[in-house]
Amino acid sequence: MQLNFAKYQAAGNDFIIIDNFQDQHYTYSPVLTKQLCHRQFGIGADGIISIEKKAGYDFALLHYNADGSQGRGLCGNGSRSALHYAQVLGIIDQKAYFNAIDGAHIGCIHNELVDLTLQDVNSIQPLASGYFLNNGTRHYVEMVDSIDLIHMEVVGFPKRNMYPFEKEGININFAQLIAPDAIQIRTCECGLDAEPLSCGTGAVASALVASSYYGLNSPVKVSTKGGKLQVTFTRLPDGRFIDIHLVGPVYQSFYGIVHPASLLPIVAYNPL
């Protein structure tokens, strides 16, 4: 069996995009997913996005994490990358109505710039030293003064299983105000063993927290290690957020063909 794929990145958040809409059929396997995403023993990526057929939609997206697990929430940058690839494949033109794990979304493509709508956010709740919200994915956001001083391995990753998310986990974001209309963020995600260069839904979550508690108005510019994103929204008097959009460029790195049977098992480094 051979598997055709496209490699994409959006603000450095990289994905293997698989066309399950047309001829081939990728069957989810935790072991194979982990192998494909491994940066030494596979193609290398933060995750896999599969484009699927679904009645009533232009297409549906399935998301798998680099650790082999299935995504439990919306993947913002992965969805934007898949939107671009769906246009390349001729599945859509410039606009799409598609389904993800959290429900229906609309995406618009203007060359490399891809605009993704997200679900309304009805509340942002204080939690520990930060705030919790769900924008299709659970996020914890903590505002800090010096984001570059954060040691993710020590401070960030352990918080992914903080109370009350010990079992299912939660994505952790640190955000710093850098201008009256801009923030800088870093994220550690469930399903990833290393800090990604960006996280789309994390950018949105951080922008909404900055708006709700620090007065930033739409649009909010978000800087990440991998590039810049923009978040637009309407903030209602009761604190709810509607008409939420994540906007930014996506880039196709390359096409490829992989023969899964030829992949070597992932082995742990064993120094002599």
What are these regions (language model features)?
Residues 1-111, 133, 141-272:
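A glycine-rich beta-to-alpha transition motif near the start of alpha/beta enzyme domains, typified by
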